[in-house]
Amino acid sequence: MAAVVFSLRRSGPVLRLSGALQVSRGAQTAAAPASQAAARIKKFAIYRWDPDKPGDKPRMQTYEVDLNTCGPMVLDALIKIKNEVDPTLTFRRSCREGICGSCAMNINGGNTLACTVRIDTNLSKVSKIYPLPHMYVVKDLVPDLSNFYAQYKSIEPYLKKKDKSQQGKEQYLQSIEDRDKLDGLYECILCACCSTSCPSYWWNADKYLGPAVLMQAYRWMIDSRDDFTEERLSKLQDPFSLYRCHTIMNCTRTCPKGLNPGKAIAEIKKMMAMYKERAVSA
């Protein structure tokens, strides 16, 4: 059967992909299979604790993974350990592409997503993996996010209209300029990396809403289609819900989506100042 030759012509000479493919296949043939290559053993020290196991105490357990037979991300290593070494290792994961936020954990000292962080290929270093800090732990790398989700629910993160006569009948129109204001806010995946990196949230998690929830509150405050901006601001007037933010900015540094919760909180504070001025003059 004759080989099919593909050609791509740009501004210069013709590039024949058949030759490139032949070179690629030759390189693959010449390379030694992963099973024959020298093992690249990487150590992972992982936080373990099972509250249902009598007498079990929090500890770090070390596992070894051959990087030649493992995907490039930390989540790949965790899945390999669970599938091939220790099925009792417990962690959350779902999308594997930085969308769902399920695999948020503390990796080598920073809060991030295991599915988007590459394994440190320095074999002399042990990669340390903990659950998100200052949270109750369900088991191993699974934090209890009940309080976090309750706080998110408290801000009513959905569109609210005072005139409900048109609800469900047609779309609420929004200008391109107003829609652009929501960029950098709606992309939040509620992974809790930012909130659990915030010292103010560590100290006052029962009262301070934290950067993730406050950024979502701001997202609805500035939505031109929402009619409850004043009411949303009113709910944040107490000393703790908003004002425990001291612009430490750990939240912005750690966000795996590159968002800026610290800036959103600062904008709420400016809106709050104007809101209080209006309340005094009224």
From Swiss-Prot:
Enzyme Commission (EC) number: 1.3.5.1, 1.1.5.-
Binding site for [3Fe-4S] cluster: C198, C245, C251
Domain (2Fe-2S ferredoxin-type): residue spans on this chain: 42-135
Compartments where found: Mitochondrion inner membrane
Cofactor or coenzyme needed: [2Fe-2S] cluster; [3Fe-4S] cluster; [4Fe-4S] cluster
Transit peptide: 1-26
Reaction equation(s) it catalyzes: a quinone + succinate = fumarate + a quinol; (R)-malate + a quinone = enol-oxaloacetate + a quinol; (S)-malate + a quinone = enol-oxaloacetate + a quinol
GO CC, alphabetical: mitochondrial inner membrane; mitochondrial membrane; respiratory chain complex II (succinate dehydrogenase)
List of residues binding [4Fe-4S] cluster: C188, C191, C194, C255
Binding, [2Fe-2S] cluster: C95, C100, C103, C115
Description of activity control: Enol-oxaloacetate inhibits the succinate dehydrogenase activity.
GO biological process: aerobic respiration; respiratory electron transport chain; tricarboxylic acid cycle
Quaternary structure annotation from Swiss-Prot or TrEMBL: Component of complex II composed of four subunits: the flavoprotein (FP) sdha, iron-sulfur protein (IP) sdhb, and a cytochrome b composed of sdhc and sdhd.
NCBIfam families attached to this UniProt entry: dhsB (TIGR00384), PRK05950.1 (NF004616)
Protein name: Succinate dehydrogenase [ubiquinone] iron-sulfur subunit, mitochondrial
Species the sequence originates in: Xenopus laevis (African clawed frog)
Name of the gene encoding the protein in the UniProt record: sdhb
